[in-house]
Amino acid sequence: LADLRIVRHIKDGAEHWNTWRDSTDLAEIDLQKVDLSSLKLRGINLSETNLSRVNFSRTDLTQANLSRAILQETVFVNANLQGANLSRALIHQVNFNQANLQDVNLTNTDLRSLELRGINLGAANLSGADLRGVNLSGGSFKNIDFSGANLSGANLQNADFGGANLSNANLSNAKMSRVKMRGALLTRANLWGASLDFADISMAGCLMANFSETILNKAILNKANLGGAIFSGAQMVGAELCNAFLSDASLSMANLTKANLSEADLSYAYLFRAILSNSICIETKFRNAEMQEVDLSMAFLKKANFAIANLQRAYFGGADLSEAVLIGANLTQANLTNANLTNIVTESTIWTDANLQGAIGFSP
């Protein structure tokens, strides 16, 4: 049990405690199981202290330092921890019910045992936090810093991460159906194998993010910055990518059937064997794109720009390419049977062994 003389020091207030603590051996400080409820301890330094089973209910711990503290079965019911530092604290079976955790620092902290849903985190810092397999479904985490956090295998379904910073975060195999990430930052985030169907990732910054093998069916990525992102093998059926920036992105063998890519920029993108059948690509930019064996059957490609694109063995069966730009494009062995080629723009276009049977509006 804690030494009552030590307890008296803390009950004399944060300023007195901090001064006393500076001249005391930390090994002598034991506050386990102490009742410190309803106290005013703003700015108190409790770092590296064993606070197991301490009762902080209704206590003011604003700007308190609890970094590297041991918080096993500690109670913070209705406590005010706004701006507190809990970085690298050992947190296990802690009760934060109705606590104020706005702007709290939880960097590099293992939070796997913590129930974060329903907690007011404000603009908390969870960068580098360990959140593997946690359940955050339905929670609101807008504008929170999760940069470098490990959320692999986590349940984020229906959660709101609008404006959050998830750059360099690990979200591999996470359950993210209907997640809201509008305007979030996902630069270099790893989302390999994540389920993101019906997710809203519009206007998000996803430069160099890894979406390989993800499920993005009916997801919304309008106006997202996806430059250099990897979508290899991703399922993106019916996805919305209007005005999205996908320059240098890799979409090899991605399934974009019925997706809407109108006015998107896929310049220099890699689309080997990608499926875009029945997709809508009005005024989409495919300049310099690598599109060998791509499936664009029945796609609506009006005014799409394929200048200098590599379209060898591409399949355009029944596609509408009216007013499309094909200047310098390589259509060697491409299949354009029954395609609409009305008013296409061609110059230095390569048609070697292309199949134009039934095509209308053009004859090379």
Residues covered by each model-derived region:
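Tandem repeat scaffolds
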Residues: 5-8, 16, 20-364
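Terminal targeting and flexible regions in eukaryotic proteins, enriched
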Residues: 1-2
